UniProtKB/Swiss-Prot annotation:
This protein is involved in the repair of mismatches in DNA. It is possible that it carries out the mismatch recognition step. This protein has a weak ATPase activity. Belongs to the DNA mismatch repair MutS family. The keyword Protein biosynthesis does not apply. GO terms for cellular component: cytosol. The gene is mutS. This is DNA mismatch repair protein MutS. It comes from Staphylococcus epidermidis (strain ATCC 35984 / DSM 28319 / BCRC 17069 / CCUG 31568 / BM 3577 / RP62A). CDD domains: ABC_MutS1.
Length: 873
C-alpha cells in the first residue's frame, strides 16, 4: 500500500467521507468499486470480482459495472438496503492534464430513490426521523412526491404505531437506539442512519408549535439535502399533524386484520387494500393506502366523504366517464418531483401535459354532479397557461434523451428553426449528391454514409473497385474495409462542416431550451401539487363508489349513543374469494348495556372471520366508505385491538403465549369505552386452568374498567356461565350440525352458547388417521362420564375455586364464584392400546349417536324413543 497510485489515493480520500456507502467510482465508461466495497457488491450483484495491480504483492479487490446500465445494479443494491454514493468525473479526461477531478454528486439510499424504475408507483417511499427527549418528535418525507409531515407524542407505543403506519424504507436518528427498540424497528426497516449533528440551516419552520418537531424536521431535511446535493424545492412546507386525530391500530392489529399485507403470502392480494383498490391514478392508489392506515375519527369529515360517495353512487354514467378521464392522468406528484430534481425528460413532460389536459373535463363533470362535489373540489384548477406552453413547445413523441435533439416543434424558436433547416437542406443536398455520383461513376451501389469517427463519406464495395480510378473522380481514400473502400471529396468535406455545425448547434440549443422550459415549469410546483392531492382524493372516493355498487354495500350511519348494529354483515375480502352467494351474512348488536359478545362454536366454523369482519367494517366506515351489510349503525372507534391466531415471535425469542399476553396487555391497558377489542381464544397457549382463569379475568376486567366493545371467542365453555354475573355479556355461537357422524358448518351466528367444540369431527375433516380419531373418541367418552374432568397432576386439590369479578370492586352481595369440584382422589387415566377401536357399543347407542335432534319434531322424537325402548326390552 506504500506505493499506492494518485488515483487510488483520490479514491480512498473520497471513500473515507462516505464509509457507510458503496462508492461507485467513475473511471471512463465504468463505475468501479474497490476493497471491501468490491467484495460486497460482487457478491450481491453476482458480478466478477477481479484484482487491480494483480502482479503486485497486495493486489486490490475490484469489480465494476458499465455506467450506461448502472441504474439496474443500483436498484438491486438499494432494494437490499445498501446506500450507494455516485462519484463522477467532473472534467473531461481528454482536456485535463494530470488527475481528473472527481466528486460525489449524489447518495442514493432506500429512502431517497428518485428514479421511476426503482419505485412502486402505488406505494410511497418514505424516509423518517425521530428524536427522543422525554417526549418524541417524528417527521417523515417522500422525496419523490414532496410530502413532508411532522408530529410529537409522549410514549414509545405511539412511536411504534406511527413507524408501523408510515412503514418507512429508511430511518434517520440522532442517537443510538436501545437494543429492544432497535429490534422492534428492524422488523420494519434495517436501514437506520445515526446523524448526530443538526445544522442551523433555515428551512422556514417557524410555524411548528413544539421544539422537538422543529429539531426532527431539521434532522431529516439536513440528511436529505446531504444525500441529494441538488434542488429540492418540490418538498412541501411541513404539515403538522396529531396521531390522536386518527383511529389507532398497532402492528398486530394491522397484521391480524390483513389491511394492506396478507399474513401468509406477504403480498397485497387478499387484503382490504386489494379489495378496495379501484383507483385509476398512482396518486389515488397511494392515497387509498394512507386512508386505510389512518381511518378518521371526526364524524363531520367522515360524512363529507360518504356524501361524495353517495353522489357518485347515484350517477353511474358520470362516474364511469370520470373514471375514463382519471385513467388518462399520470403520476403528477412524482413528475413534479422529477422536474424540481432535474431528472425529468421530454416524455415525462408530455405525460404532464396529458394529465393537466384532463383537469377541465374532470371539473366540468364534477359541476354536473351537484353542489356537494362542486364545493368539495372547488380548488381543482385548470392550468391553461401551463398546458399552452407544453402544447406549443414539445413534439408529441420526443426521444428519451434530452441531449440528442428532436424535442421541440417547428416554430417554437426561430434560431432553432434556422439550424434545423440548414441541417435538413444539407441532408437533401447529400441525397442529391449521392444520385449524381452514382450516375457520374456508373456505380449503382455507391452510397453516402455517416459515423461519428469519420463524419460523412462515400462508400464503394470492393466488387465495384475493379478498373475504378478514384483520383479521376476527385476521391480521396479515407478508410479501407474488408469488403469496401471509403472516400471523401473536397465538396463533401465542405458541406459536412455546414451540416454537422448546424446539427451540433441545434442539439446544443435544444438542450438549453429544455432546461429553460424545465425551470419555468418548476414555478408551477405548488399549484401542480395541489391539483395532484385533489385528484388523488377524488380517485379514492370514486373507487369507494365503484366497489360499493359492484358488491352491494350500504352507507353506514354513526350513533352518538355508542350503538353498533350490523345487519347481515359480511367479510368484504372473504366473500370475494368465495363462490357467488356462498358467504353467510351475520348480525351484530352491541351497545352500552351489552358490549361483550362471548362467542363459542367449533373450529373452522367462522368465529375469527366474524370478529374480523366487524373490525374491518368499522375501519371501512371511518374511512368514509360504504360497508358490506344490509344496514350498518356504528360508533366511532378511537382504537382497535386484536389478538387473533397463533404466532411465535422468533426474532425476540417470545413464545406464542407470551406474544398473546403482550397483545392482550396493550388492549387491557389502553382501551377506552370508545375502543373495539377482538380476542380470539385467549389463553389457549398455556394449561387449561391457567388459560381459563386468564380468559375469565380479562373479560371481567373489560366489564369493570374500559367498557370497550369486545368480541371474545373461546373453547372454554365454562365461561358461558358468566352471562349470569355480567349483564354486559351476551353468549352467541356459530352454529354447526352433526349429521350421521359428519359435521356441517352453518356459519350462522345465533344467540346462546354451545357446549361442544366438535374437535374430533374437525380432526376427521383434516383426514387424521382413523385409528387416532377412534382413540380420541374413546378418551373423550371416558372424560365425559366424569362430573368434571381433570388432568392427573400431583397438586390437584380436593376442591378448587376460581374467583369471579368481585376482586375488581364488587360488593359482598354481588360476589360469585365458579367452583370446580374434583373427586377425593386424583383421577388416574386408564391406559389403552392406541389401536383399540371404540369400546363395545350396542346398536341402540349407535342409533342414538346418529340422531339429528335439531331437525326432529316432538312427535318424531317420541316415536323414535318408543322404538328404542322396545329394542331394549
Amino acid at each position: 500500500m506504500a506505493n499506492i497510485t494518485p488515483m487510488m489515493q483520490q479514491y480512498l480520500k473520497i471513500k473515507s467521507e462516505y464509509d457507510d456507502c458503496l462508492l461507485f467510482f467513475r473511471l471512463g465508461d465504468f463505475y468501479e468499486m474497490f476493497f471491501d466495497d468490491a467484495k460486497e457488491a460482487s457478491r450481491v450483484l453476482e458480478i466478477t470480482l477481479t484484482k487491480r495491480d494483480a502482479k503486485k504483492e497486495n493486489p486490490i479487490p475490484m469489480c465494476g459495472v458499465p455506467y450506461h446500465s448502472a441504474d439496474n445494479y443500483i436498484e438491486t443494491l438499494i432494494n437490499k438496503g445498501y446506500k450507494v454514493a455516485i462519484c463522477e468525473q467532473m472534467e473531461d479526461p481528454k482536456q485535463t492534464k494530470g488527475m481528473v477531478r472527481r466528486e460525489v454528486v449524489r447518495i442514493i439510499t432506500p429512502g431517497t430513490v428518485m428514479d421511476q424504475n426503482g419505485m412502486d408507483e402505488k406505494k410511497n417511499n418514505y424516509i423518517l426521523s425521530f428524536i427522543e427527549n422525554e417526549e418524541f418528535g417524528l417527521c417523515y418525507c417522500d422525496v419523490s412526491t414532496g410530502e413532508l409531515k411532522v408530529t410529537h407524542f409522549k410514549d414509545t407505543a405511539t412511536l411504534l404505531n406511527e413507524i408501523t403506519t408510515i412503514n418507512p424504507n429508511e430511518i434517520v436518528i440522532k442517537q443510538a437506539l436501545s437494543e429492544e427498540l432497535k429490534r422492534q424497528i428492524n422488523m420494519i426497516t434495517e436501514t437506520i442512519t445515526v446523524r448526530e449533528d443538526i445544522s442551523d440551516e433555515d428551512y422556514d419552520m417557524n410555524q411548528l408549535t413544539h421544539q422537538l418537531m422543529h429539531d426532527t424536521t431539521q434532522l431529516l431535511l439536513d440528511y436529505i439535502h446531504h444525500t441529494q446535493k441538488r434542488d429540492l424545492s418540490h418538498i412541501e412546507e411541513v404539515i403538522e399533524y396529531a396521531a390522536v386525530d386518527y383511529m389507532k391500530m398497532d402492528y398486530y392489529a394491522k397484521r391480524n386484520l390483513e389491511l394492506t399485507e396478507s399474513i401468509r403470502l406477504k403480498s397485497k392480494k387478499g387484503t382490504l387494500l386489494w379489495l378496495m383498490d379501484e383507483t385509476k391514478t398512482p396518486m389515488g392508489a397511494r392515497r387509498l393506502k394512507q386512508w386505510i392506515d389512518r381511518p378518521l375519527i371526526n364524524k363531520q369529515q367522515i360524512n363529507d366523504r360518504l356524501n361524495i360517495v353517495e353522489e357518485f353512487m347515484d350517477r353511474f354514467i358520470e362516474r364511469d366517464t370520470l373514471r375514463n378521464h382519471l385513467n388518462q392522468v399520470y403520476d403528477i406528484e412524482r413528475l413534479v418531483g422529477r422536474v424540481s430534481y432535474g431528472n425529468v425528460n421530454a416524455r415525462d413532460l408530455i405525460q404532464l401535459k396529458h394529465s393537466i389536459s384532463e383537469i377541465p373535463h374532470i371539473k366540468a363533470l364534477l359541476n354536473e354532479l351537484g353542489a356537494q362535489t362542486t364545493t368539495q373540489f372547488k380548488e381543482l384548477e385548470p392550468l391553461d397557461d401551463l398546458l399552452q406552453i407544453l402544447e406549443e413547445s414539445l413534439v408529441e413523441e420526443p426521444p428519451i434523451s434530452i441531449k440528442d435533439g428532436g424535442l421541440f416543434k417547428n416554430g417554437f424558436n426561430a434560431q432553432l428553426d434556422e439550424y434545423l433547416e440548414a441541417s435538413k437542406n444539407g441532408k437533401t443536398w447529400l441525397a442529391e449528391l449521392q444520385a449524381k455520383e452514382r450516375e457520374r461513376t456508373g456505380i449503382k451501389s455507391l452510397k453516402i454514409s455517416f459515423n461519428k469517427v469519420f463524419g460523412y463519406f462515400i462508400e464503394i464495395t470492393r466488387a465495384n473497385l475493379n478498373n475504378f480510378q478514384p483520383e479521376a473522380f476527385g476521391y480521396n481514400r479515407k478508410q479501407t474495409l474488408s469488403n469496401a473502400e471509403r472516400f471523401i471529396t473536397d465538396e463533401l468535406k465542405e458541406k459536412e462542416d455546414i451540416i454537422l455545425g448546424a446539427e451540433d448547434k441545434a442539439v446544443e440549443l435544444e438542450y438549453e431550451l429544455f432546461v429553460k422550459l424545465r425551470e419555468h415549469i418548476k414555478t408551477y410546483t405548488e399549484r401542480l401539487q395541489k391539483q395532484a392531492k385533489i385528484i388523488s382524493e377524488l380517485d379514492c372516493l370514486q373507487s369507494f363508489a365503484e366497489i360499493a355498487q359492484k358488491y352491494n354495500y350500504v352507507k353506514p350511519t354513526f350513533s352518538d349513543d355508542k350503538v353498533l348494529h350490523l345487519e347481515n354483515s359480511r367479510h368484504p375480502v372473504v366473500e370475494r374469494v368465495m363462490d357467488y352467494n356462498d358467504y353467510v351474512p351475520n348480525d351484530c348488536h352491541l351497545d352500552d348495556e351489552t358490549f361483550i359478545y362471548l362467542i363459542t362454536g367449533p373450529n373452522m366454523s367462522g368465529k375469527s372471520t366474524y370478529m374480523r369482519q366487524v373490525a374491518i367494517i368499522s375501519i371501512m366506515a371511518q374511512m368514509g366508505a360504504y360497508v358490506p351489510c344490509d344496514s350498518a349503525t356504528l360508533p366511532i372507534f378511537d382504537q382497535i385491538f386484536t389478538r387473533i391466531g397463533a404466532a411465535d415471535d422468533l426474532v425476540s425469542g417470545k413464545s406464542t403465549f407470551m406474544v398473546e399476553m403482550l397483545e392482550a396487555q396493550k388492549a387491557l391497558t389502553y382501551a377506552t369505552e370508545n375502543s373495539l377489542i377482538i380476542f380470539d381464544e385467549i389463553g389457549r397457549g398455556t394449561s387449561t386452568y391457567d388459560g381459563l382463569a386468564l380468559a375469565q379475568a380479562m373479560i371481567e376486567y373489560v366489564a369493570q374498567t374500559s367498557h370497550a366493545k369486545t368480541l371474545f371467542s373461546t373453547h372454554y365453555h365454562e365461561l358461558t356461565s358468566l352471562d349470569q354475573m355480567l349483564k354486559c355479556l351476551k353468549n352467541v355461537h356459530v352454529a354447526a350440525n352433526e349429521y350421521q357422524g359428519e359435521l356441517i358448518f352453518l356459519h350462522k351466528v345465533k344467540d346462546g352458547a354451545v357446549d361442544d367444540s366438535y374437535g374430533i369431527q374437525v380432526a376427521k375433516l383434516a383426514d387424521l388417521p382413523n385409528e387416532v380419531i377412534d382413540r380420541a373418541q374413546v378418551i373423550l367418552n371416558a372424560f365425559e362420564q366424569k362430573p368434571s374432568y381433570q388432568l392427573s397432576h400431583e397438586n390437584t386439590d380436593n376442591q378448587q375455586t376460581v374467583p369471579s369479578y368481585n376482586d375488581f370492586g364488587r360488593t359482598e352481595e354481588e360476589q360469585s364464584v365458579i367452583e370446580t369440584h374434583t373427586s377425593n382422589h386424583n383421577y388416574e387415566q386408564a391406559t389403552f392400546d392406541l389401536f383399540d377401536g371404540y369400546n363395545q357399543q350396542s346398536e341402540v347407542e349407535c342409533q342414538i349417536r346418529e340422531l339429528n335432534l335439531s331437525n326432529m319434531t316432538p312427535l318424531e322424537a317420541l316415536i323414535k324413543l318408543n322404538e328404542l325402548q322396545s329394542q331394549l326390552k
